[in-house]
């Protein structure tokens, strides 16, 4: 059974597939280079790579640099190159901006900056962490402990004995200063002893005190504790050499202070007041009740206030500020905090057209000690990455996520240890039975998604807000992750890469509303060999629904800018791997992979802004700034796009005597350079006369110049298809002899279609745009037309290849196709 059949290809929107031809969609091809899949325009040429500026005219940059973008706001967009020992910054017009390295230059030392340097932007700061550096604690410590004691007299009681006994290791015996309070029977003489300040003064000075009334029945003496022998009655703790030779004594109202000489800590001090030390007590190093601190003290005194027995985490330190005021402070001989030279540094936008790279003064520990206000867990470890989330700077180290204090991007320590505040720093580990090192993060579904090599974690909270007591890191999925490529977010999706044999897989990660779980679909499942293994960057442009993957070639031996006289060459480094997608009311109706090739160029990195992609590119023997407009707009003057790489607009000078126009190429001599009249759109051959100077015949003062590039679409093998529950299914039984294929095109210039039968010569069909008798066929302007080109094939469906090619500067829009052939099948399908 047989007959003539025809089948429509409604569009070419879904790029390429590396599946077998029978598994491909009807609107997928086998190869697509330098073409764009657009929902409105169909299959068209990719946008040109516009030349903006030469970033460095004398140096090329190795692929080991760390490319970074700074996007402060619409008016502050910058490209940055970090390399071994230095950093350079350019605006998006290609102007290099001055960078002062004020301090910390050694932090930029790296044999592989692309791998070692991890960055995050926060306002005018770009924080940079060097993965090769181990973070250390500051060796500078707080003030050393003062070996001191206080005697605090708080109440007075008649008839009681107030006694203080001190013993220093260098003393031969303990010395006791005792005051026998008067009975209170003679108020005229006894009332002076009611003041606690007077009691302290008498213990300090003996009967020489102005407050000792000898007419009372009070008694004072300074005695040896071992024998009870009286040493003095006129001298006390602060005036007798028996004590002052070993202690530096001072007094305040109601308070006596003693400091052990030479810092010797092996001394004792005992008090007795006849009332169980409720009227007078000593304080040495610590106290359990904050309210018992003396009202007066020295401003260099620090006392630990202890919490519950056995709970060292409830201890805190206070320092005397002024009368009656003790303020929480850091303990004695405690590391002040972090070693700034090993911590992340910053590139700072000075908002005057200049930048400064410098070491950061990270906030010191101001309270507690190494237990109650411990170092963040990244100390003595290497930093894996940086992030910013909910007004906190974050650090990933080992399996921990560490956040600064809320809105305080330089502080990793609590400001009080007496309570846990919601704004305090956060330090949590990823949950799970295995230790999973955290490498990266991305904002996702109103939360933060973190990546280890084998799992994903979501930052959550057991309360309404994320705080030190409520934050949790729960595993939400278990996909392998390539930590060489930073994940990106796009709307409600996140994209991340995986290593797959010698290639790269990319997953589209999403929250499944039906199952309330997270999942990740492999969007490269049909193009498993497309993206090479050395992928290093994903670029997301949500304005134009485009994802771009960049890959490098073998790592350069250079780690800083260098001079070369040899033009750069590349294998993968000049290629952009393009994923075009489109959602219609929540349903994905387009998923198209292709590649854009920038010949003889090495792309170092890119950034997305609005509908544009900006690339830092080594081309020739220097480094350039390239701009791609993903909208692929038509030129408003000539009515169509001009498709040239390194495209730029130049002004020519016309000489009527020679009938030549002269112009200067901003990027020097280029093989294959052509000129396009920006008024009529015609192309002209140019002649290089000297240096960067070119000429062309005629008067053409407004010009586009650039290098033509070739666009190629290889059509998939065609099959007769029938509808099933899975869509159109290819029928492989029978013989399908294709007679011709008709392509419908819109507003296109020159292109050609090549048919190459197996074992036979290639035949060509040309669309030159000229259709006799139509309004679009005019002399002196490029031929642009719409219509249908019918290509004869006369081959079995599996015995030929069909390529659509164009190297013209003119546009090409292929809308759809119609395949006509003869199909014969000996059997009938049931």
Language model features with spans:
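N-terminal beta-propeller domains
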Residues: 1-96, 285-385, 389-437, 498-518, ...
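Beta-sheet repeat architectures centered on beta-propellers
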Residues: 7-76, 502-830
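Beta-propeller and closely related beta-pinwheel folds
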Residues: 53-59, 361-391, 396-546, 550-608, ...
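Short linear interaction motifs
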Residues: 61-63, 101-117, 362-384, 430-439, ...
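WD40 beta-propeller blade core
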Residues: 88, 457-458, 626
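A short, polar beta-strand/turn micro-motif
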Residues: 137-150, 463-482, 709-727
């Amino acid at each position: 059974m047989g007959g003539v059949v025809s089948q429509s290809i409604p569009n070419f929107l879904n790029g390429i597939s590396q599946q077998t031809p029978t598994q491909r969609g009807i609107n997928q091809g086998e190869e697509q280079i330098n073409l764009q899949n657009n929902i409105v325009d169909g299959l068209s040429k990719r946008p040109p790579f516009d030349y903006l500026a030469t970033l460095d005219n004398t140096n090329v940059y190795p692929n080991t640099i760390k490319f970074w973008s700074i996007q402060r706001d619409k008016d502050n967009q910058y490209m940055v190159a970090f390399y071994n020992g230095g950093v350079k910054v350019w605006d998006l017009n290609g102007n290099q901006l001055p960078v002062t390295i004020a301090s910390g230059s050694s932090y930029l030392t790296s044999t592989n900056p692309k791998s070692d340097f991890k960055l995050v932007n926060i306002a005018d700061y770009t924080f940079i962490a060097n993965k090769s550096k181990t973070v250390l604690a500051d060796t500078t410590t707080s003030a050393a402990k003062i070996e001191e004691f206080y005697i605090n007299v708080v109440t007075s009681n008649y008839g009681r004995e107030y006694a203080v006994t001190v013993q220093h290791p260098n003393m031969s015996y303990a010395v006791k200063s005792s005051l026998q309070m008067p009975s209170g029977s003679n108020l005229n003489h006894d009332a002076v002893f009611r003041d606690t300040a007077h009691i302290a003064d008498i213990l300090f000075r003996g009967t020489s005190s102005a407050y000792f009334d000898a007419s009372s029945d009070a008694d004072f003496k300074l005695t040896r504790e071992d024998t009870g022998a009286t040493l003095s009655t006129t001298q006390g703790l602060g005036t007798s050499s028996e004590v002052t030779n070993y202690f530096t004594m001072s007094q305040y109202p109601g308070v006596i202070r003693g400091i052990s000489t030479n810092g010797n800590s092996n001394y004792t001090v005992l008090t007795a007041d006849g009332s169980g030390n409720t009227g007078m007590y000593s304080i040495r190093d610590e106290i359990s009740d904050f309210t018992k601190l003396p009202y007066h003290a020295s401003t260099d005194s620090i006392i630990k206030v202890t919490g519950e027995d056995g709970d060292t985490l409830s201890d805190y330190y206070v320092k005397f500020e002024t009368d009656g005021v003790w303020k929480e402070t850091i303990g004695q001989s405690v590391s002040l905090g972090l070693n700034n030279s090993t911590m992340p540094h910053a590139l700072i936008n000075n908002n005057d057209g200049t930048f400064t790279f410098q070491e950061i003064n990270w906030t010191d520990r101001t309270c507690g000690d190494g237990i109650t206000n411990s170092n963040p867990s990244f100390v003595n470890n290497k930093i894996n990455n940086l992030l910013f989330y909910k007004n906190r700077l974050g650090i990933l180290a080992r399996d921990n996520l560490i956040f600064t204090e809320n809105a305080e991007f330089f502080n990793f320590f609590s400001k009080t240890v007496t309570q846990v505040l919601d704004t305090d720093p956060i330090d949590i580990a990823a949950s799970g039975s295995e230790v999973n090192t955290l490498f990266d993060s991305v904002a996702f579904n109103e939360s933060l998604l973190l990546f280890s090599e084998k799992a994903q974690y979501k930052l959550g909270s057991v309360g309404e807000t994320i705080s030190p007591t409520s934050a949790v890191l729960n595993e939400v999925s278990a996909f392998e992750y390539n930590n060489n490529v930073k994940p990106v977010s796009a709307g409600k999706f996140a994209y991340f890469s995986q290593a797959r044999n010698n290639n790269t897989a990319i997953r589209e990660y999403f929250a499944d509303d039906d199952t309330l779980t997270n999942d990740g679909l492999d969007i490269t499942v049909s193009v498993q060999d497309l993206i090479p293994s050395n992928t290093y960057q994903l670029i997301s442009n949500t304005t134009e629904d485009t994802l771009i993957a960049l890959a490098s070639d073998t790592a350069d031996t250079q780690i800083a800018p260098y001079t070369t006289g040899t033009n750069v060459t590349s294998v993968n480094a000049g290629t952009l791997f393009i994923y075009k997608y489109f959602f219609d009311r929540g349903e994905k109706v387009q998923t198209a992979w292709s590649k854009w090739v920038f010949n003889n160029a090495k792309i170092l990195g890119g950034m997305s802004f609005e509908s544009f992609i900006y690339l830092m590119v080594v081309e020739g023997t220097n480094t350039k700034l390239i701009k791609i407009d993903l909208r692929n707009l038509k030129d408003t003057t000539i009515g169509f796009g001009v498709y040239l790489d390194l495209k730029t607009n130049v002004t020519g000078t016309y000489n009527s005597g020679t009938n030549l126009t002269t112009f200067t190429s901003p990027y020097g001599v280029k093989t294959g350079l052509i000129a396009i009249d920006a008024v009529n759109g015609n192309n002209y051959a140019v002649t290089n006369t000297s240096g960067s100077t070119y000429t062309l015949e005629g008067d053409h003062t407004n010009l586009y110049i650039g290098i033509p590039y070739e666009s190629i679409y290889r059509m998939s093998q065609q099959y007769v298809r029938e509808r099933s529950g899975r869509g159109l299914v290819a029928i492989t039984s029978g013989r399908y002899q294709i007679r011709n294929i008709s392509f419908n095109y819109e507003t296109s210039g020159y292109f050609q279609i090549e048919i190459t039968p197996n074992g036979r010569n290639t035949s060509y069909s040309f669309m030159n745009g000229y259709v006799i008798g139509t309004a679009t066929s005019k002399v002196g302007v490029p031929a642009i037309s719409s219509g249908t080109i019918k290509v004869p094939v006369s081959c079995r469906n599996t015995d030929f290849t069909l390529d659509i090619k164009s190297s013209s500067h003119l546009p090409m829009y292929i809308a759809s196709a119609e395949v006509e052939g003869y199909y014969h099948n000996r059997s009938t399908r049931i």
